[in-house]
Structures are given as structure tokens and as C-alpha cells.
Amino acid sequence: MHARVNPAGSAAGTDPSAARSAYYERIARLNLKPLWEVLAALVPPAPVTDAVPALWRWQDTQPLLMESGRLITAREAERRVLILENPGLAGQFTCTPTIYAGLQLILPGEVAPAHRHTQSALRFVVDGEGAYTAVDGERVTMSPGDFIVTPMWTWHDHGNPGGEPVIWLDGLDIQVVRLLGAQFRDGHDSDSQSVARPEGDALARYGSNMLPDGFAPRNGVTPIFSYPYRQSRAALFALKEGPRHRCHGVKMRYVNPATGGAPMPTIGTFLQLLPAGFSGAPYRSTDAAVFSVVEGSVRVELDDRRIDAGPKDQFVIPSWYRYRLHAAEDTVLFSFSDRPIQLALHLWREHEGDA
């Protein structure tokens, strides 16, 4: 007589859960897993993330950064940074699942030694004057609001010959490069790389609505590495009285002048103006974004919480979180995300409104 089998595939009279558990234990020893047990989690109907909205207040981070300057030198640390770790991603040293962010301090007289790595990096100057970043043989003086690019595998170092501490926001694609198994880093023979070009050379050569005759873009990386805030701010305020986006106010994206694309292949960067009295419509997108308040203050309304951020504060909005921006005064926000990756893979989505 043959055993009668029910539709679930187990013999009549037996406990299917016990049979399945025994089966799962057997296949686990062969490094096999049943997809049907995890399919809903692996392929959800909408984005799911462990990251949560979070705020880092300048009144908290600035004193702690200065304390770090008394505890360890820039040379000892190589990069003296306090990581903005998302509380939903504790222990992962990251702000979003794909974007690392941190606040870096360099004191007067210090040099953060030259190195290079396969991760692309950005610097957004938050506080202080007189420091510099050197990238690929050219130095640029750093001022608050400046956006600076360190392309992958280019030598870069930082120094502060000025008289005051300088703090900037770092953003890197560390998690993306780690996921791809392509992490490399190399130290320079000297603390400071040799300067081969005068300051402003790249900006004049590639950022003046012209390109050198015969120039060919390389690797999708911007040929200029400094985007001065004075120019970017002037553009925003020139557009203040014109049409504005109902969710973002006046929002502009930084571009590679050679291609019109993002300055870096993996990180998109943006600057936006919320005019005084602005109350934005609800918005969400698949790229989680890190924000820095440059001027003014902003109230961010999310479905389950509110963030009130002022000058030099940083905050993060995870993927597919619906939010609204409100500003009582003219407010400028810098932000960055992994949007270029999502666009290249045809994954990026956005939605305006409540529905």
C-alpha cells in the first residue's frame, strides 16, 4: 500500500511543520536555504529599510569634535572624524545603507596625511576658514558652504595653515565599494602631495562654460573638484522669485561640466533654497538623503515624527520616507544621496503628494 499524500506534500497523519523543520536542518548542512520562507522579505512590495530619520545638532557635535582634537592628533587618526551613524544601523558605521557620512576636524597647524582610496568622497565645509584640501596636485582653500570632490583613487590631503579650527561634512560610497569587494587604499610617501598647478586652475579650465580643446571626459568624474558656495548661492537667490518646485522650493543639482551628469558616479549632490514662508508638498523618493543646513532653519514633517534643524545641523531621511519641508526664513540646504547609482540601474523612483 502506498502512503497517501495531502496537497501540502506531507504524508497523511504527520505534522508538516516538523517534517519541514527537519528538512530545513538537512539542507542547511549543505548551505542551502528555502526561498519560499524568505521570498516576501527579499522581494517586498515597497522599499524596506532599517535606517531611520535622525538629527545631529551642531550644539552637540561641535563640542565633541573639539574634544576629539584634544585627545588625538590628525596625524595619529589619519582622518579625525566623528561618524554620523544611523541609530537604525548601529554597528555598521553608516548613515544610510549605501552612504557614509561624518564630521571631520582639522586644527590650525595640522596636516591630515595624503592618501588615496577606491571610494569616492565629498567634503562640504560646515564651519571655519583657512584650511585647504589638495586633490591630484592642486590645492583649494576651504570656506563654509564649499562643496569639494575627491574622485576615487586620487591623492588627497588636508591642511590648516590658518588660525581657526575647520570642520566639514564627509560623504563617501564606502558601503557600495565594500559590497562590490573593491576596497583599496594607499598611503603617500609624504604627508602633503606636491602641488603641480596653481589654485583655481581646474575651475578656470573646466568650470567657466568652456572646456580645453581636445579634452575628453574620463571615468564619469568631474574635472573640477571645487564648487564655491558663493557661486552656487548666487544662482539659488537669482531664482528665488521665479517658479519653484512645490516640494523642494528652488533645488539645483551639482553637475560634471564635461557631461552634465553627477560630479561622481555614485553620489549625487544638491543645493536648495526654501524661501521664507515656504511650506512644501509631501515628497518621497527611493534615494535616502543626508542633509546639512547651510543657512536658516527647517522643519521636516514625517509620518511619525518631526525634525527641527538649524544652522550647521545634519539630518538624514531614509529611502521612501514621506516628508514635507517648512521654512519660516530663507533656508539653504545641501544634500547628497546615491541617486546616480539608482538612475544608472533604472531603479530610482519619486512620488509627490499624499497618495
What are these regions (language model features)?
Residues 2-96, 186, 193-266, 270:
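A short, N-terminal "cap"/entry segment at the start of jelly-roll beta-barrel domains
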Residues 89-100, 107-121, 137, 259-268, ...:
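A short beta-loop-beta micro-motif enriched in histidine and acidic residues
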Residues 148-205:
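Contiguous mid-protein beta-loop-alpha structural module that forms a pocket-lining wall or clamp
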Residues 107-144, 150-154, 159, 284-311:
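A short beta-strand-loop-beta hairpin characteristic of the jelly-roll/cupin
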Residues 135, 141-162, 168-173, 276, ...:
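Conserved metal-binding segment of the jelly-roll/cupin
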Residues 104, 272, 315:
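Conserved GNAT-family N-acetyltransferase fold
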Residues 258-260, 267-273, 283-286, 296, ...:
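C-terminal structured domain segments across diverse proteins
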Residues 104, 122-124, 149, 163-182, ...:
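A short hydrophobic beta-strand segment most commonly corresponding to one strand
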